[in-house]
């Protein structure tokens, strides 16, 4: 590294030394300096995400080793992306804002000893643009400058042409304490969440970008980011698209305060196991069964509002269930087809009495937990995320029943 970059490099070394004791942050070994160069030794990695997906460009040749890495990522994309959220959470816990999350800076390292065979280990690298938050401060003022890479920066890091001409991008000509402009307001950890959302989309769509247009024009990404023109069509990938769509849409919110924290990303239903998803739906049923019904409580009314998203235009969930399954519900409780409460009760009751069902009905609904969960989510794709949103809307995420879903580690 040339002498004029020594200051930047020494900052990177310092941050690497502070943060590298984590499996999803690149490992620093040593550094040496002579009169001409600074040498930094970090762990050897196999490729970057950009090397593998190449922005989705057709006709790019991949080596066998690269194709194996792509296959390993795609087999369990949730595990791969969770690692990135985990690594970023580690940096944020150390008060480090990366400011340049992008595919070129996400590397595929060699697996650690305790990893399952065939899985990959992703690490966050390149700390040249990182900034450390002082104690008791959540925002850096006047440091937006040239942080980030075009097309991967959060909207608050993108200056308008007039602002660039006036010098406001460096915090010179404007009072940041009184300005309403996001650039002048400073940098929060949320800038990394936005960029990570773009990377999540990139991996799940094999190299597409959420702010390209339908024809894939990379040149207009920055404009689309500033104008809030996300294009998430590529994420509509069938029955399993609702959870990643919800998460990425949340991460790409225009206003920093509307984005999730790294911990919230890690605890999102996208990363939950099938067993955890099914248990959550059953806990939702248990909770709302105890709400007053005549007249309905505000919480129960809010749950039923989501029936318009979960049920189709016929407004009858019973019409989507198999005849044998409906018969197995029994006559003890009456089920009304247009009610979310009854849908959740049916799901919970048959899960709890799964072994009482005939073998023919079991074959229809599949085994617990994965087959049974999919029986419901393929018929009602928005069920899980609607219940998740309802818990948040009602402020129930801190309740003992729901707290483990929103604060516990997931993978």
Per-region residue spans from a language model:
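Activation segment/activation loop of eukaryotic-type protein kinase catalytic domains
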Residues: 104-163, 167
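The N-lobe alphaC helix and its flanking beta3-alphaC-beta4 segment of protein kinase-like domains
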Residues: 2-23
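Short beta-strand micro-motifs within the conserved protein kinase catalytic domain, predominantly
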Residues: 27-38, 46
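Terminal C-lobe "cap" of eukaryotic-type protein kinase domains
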Residues: 254-258, 263-278
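Regulatory extensions appended to serine/threonine kinase catalytic cores
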Residues: 277-411
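Protein kinase catalytic-loop region centered on the HRD/HxD motif
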Residues: 84-96
């Amino acid at each position: 590294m040339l002498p004029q970059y020594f200051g930047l490099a020494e900052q990177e070394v310092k941050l690497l030394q502070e943060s590298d004791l984590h499996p999803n942050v690149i490992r620093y070994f040593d550094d040496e300096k002579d009169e001409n160069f600074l040498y930094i030794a970090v762990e050897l990695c196999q490729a970057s995400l950009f090397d593998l997906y190449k922005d989705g460009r057709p006709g790019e040749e991949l080596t066998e080793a690269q194709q194996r890495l792509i296959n390993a990522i795609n087999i369990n994309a949730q595990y791969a992306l969770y690692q990135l959220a985990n690594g970023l959470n580690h940096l944020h816990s150390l008060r480090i804002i990366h400011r340049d999350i992008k595919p070129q800076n996400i590397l595929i390292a060699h697996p650690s000893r305790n990893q399952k065979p065939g899985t990959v280990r992703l690490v966050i690298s390149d700390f040249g643009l990182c900034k450390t938050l002082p104690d008791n401060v959540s925002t850096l003022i006047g440091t937006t400058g040239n942080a980030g890479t075009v097309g991967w920066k959060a909207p608050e890091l993108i200056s308008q042409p007039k602002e660039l001409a006036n010098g406001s991008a460096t915090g010179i000509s404007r009072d940041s304490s009184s300005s309403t402009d996001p650039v002048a307001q400073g940098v929060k950890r949320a800038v990394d969440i936005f960029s990570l959302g773009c990377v999540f989309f990139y991996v799940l769509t094999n190299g597409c970008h959420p702010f390209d247009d339908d024809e894939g024009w990379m040149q207009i990404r920055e404009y689309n980011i500033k104008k809030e023109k996300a294009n998430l069509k590529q994420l509509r990938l069938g029955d399993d698209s609702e959870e990643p769509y919800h998460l990425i849409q949340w991460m790409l919110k225009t206003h920093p305060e509307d984005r999730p924290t790294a911990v919230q990303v890690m605890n999102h239903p996208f990363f939950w196991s099938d067993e955890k998803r099914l248990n959550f739906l059953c806990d939702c049923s248990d909770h709302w069964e105890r709400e007053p019904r005549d007249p309905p409580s505000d919480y129960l009314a809010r749950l039923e509002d989501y029936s318009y998203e979960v049920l189709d235009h016929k407004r009858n969930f019973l019409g989507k269930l198999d005849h044998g399954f409906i018969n197995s519900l029994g006559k003890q409780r009456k089920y009304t087809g247009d009610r979310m409460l009854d849908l959740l009760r049916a799901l919970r009751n048959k899960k709890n009495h799964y072994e009482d069902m005939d073998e023919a009905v079991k074959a229809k609904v599949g085994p617990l937990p994965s087959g049974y969960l999919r029986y419901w989510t393929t018929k009602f794709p928005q069920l899980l995320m609607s219940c998740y949103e309802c818990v948040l809307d009602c402020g129930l995420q801190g309740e003992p029943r729901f707290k483990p879903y929103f604060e516990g580690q997931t993978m």
